[in-house]
């Protein structure tokens, strides 16, 4: 029988450390791994493979949770809400994240910081030519990233540290660091802020589906706008 632990035990600690290590390695050495196997660092093939690696990681984490921890992937019981609540929640999430991202953009612009990512520009050009890859990228971000960072890691770190705010900060810092590969500070701070919003939402309302749907829609809309405003 699967049940939620009230105190940290060894498998949960090991699993959390494994995820922290995995995110670190993927952030700083993921591109080099593709180059080691003779693949171009930024190409359709490497993009598809990297997304598939995310899904594989999620499957392994879920397997670890069930077989080793003897817990569900999601420790927090999913709460259900009426459709009106879900719509209002999505709208408020969009408004909150949009306002925050705009303020971050303004702050970096006033500070004279470089907000342009050459890596991201190359990715956008690839996605402009391949809508399936664009859709797959957005779905992967919405589903896999939320299930790993918010669904798996956040509740377990809360058990370990016995403090929701510490667990939220750590998962959001990791979420931001994962975007370090784009090469600019704003590409770390922006996701960190978005992670904060989604982490506190999940902590408060215990509904991962709304967080996943928002994350997917946010990335999908931004990618559509970016590809349509980019000239080859």
Protein language model features and the residues they cover:
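Function-critical hydrophobic alpha-helical transmembrane segments in multi-pass membrane proteins
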Residues: 120-169, 173-177
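Short, Lys/Arg-rich, polar N-terminal cytosolic tail immediately upstream
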Residues: 1-8
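Aromatic-anchored segments of alpha-helical transmembrane domains
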Residues: 21-29, 95-99, 172-180, 217-225
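Functionally important transmembrane alpha-helices
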Residues: 28-32, 184-232
């Amino acid at each position: 029988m699967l049940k939620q632990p009230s105190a940290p035990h060894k498998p949960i600690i090991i699993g959390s450390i494994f995820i922290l290590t995995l995110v670190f390695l993927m952030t700083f050495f993921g591109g080099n791994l593709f180059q080691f196997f003779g693949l171009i660092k930024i190409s359709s093939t490497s993009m598809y493979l990297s997304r598939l690696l995310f899904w594989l990681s999620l499957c392994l984490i879920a397997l670890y949770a069930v077989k080793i921890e003897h817990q569900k992937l999601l420790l927090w019981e999913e709460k259900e809400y009426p459709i009106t609540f879900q719509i209002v929640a999505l709208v408020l999430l969009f408004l909150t994240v949009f306002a925050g991202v705009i303020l971050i953009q303004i702050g970096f612009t006033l500070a004279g910081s470089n907000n342009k990512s050459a890596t991201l520009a190359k990715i956008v050009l690839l996605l402009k030519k391949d809508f399936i890859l664009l859709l797959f990228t957005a779905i992967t971000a919405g589903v896999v990233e939320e299930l790993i960072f918010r669904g798996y890691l956040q509740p377990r770190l809360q058990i370990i540290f016995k403090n929701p705010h510490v667990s939220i900060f750590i998962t959001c810092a990791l979420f931001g660091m994962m975007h370090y590969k784009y090469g600019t500070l704003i590409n770390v701070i922006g996701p960190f802020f978005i992670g904060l919003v989604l982490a506190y939402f999940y902590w408060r309302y215990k509904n991962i589906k709304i967080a996943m749907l928002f994350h997917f829609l946010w990335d999908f809309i931004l990618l559509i706008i970016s590809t349509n405003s980019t000239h080859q």
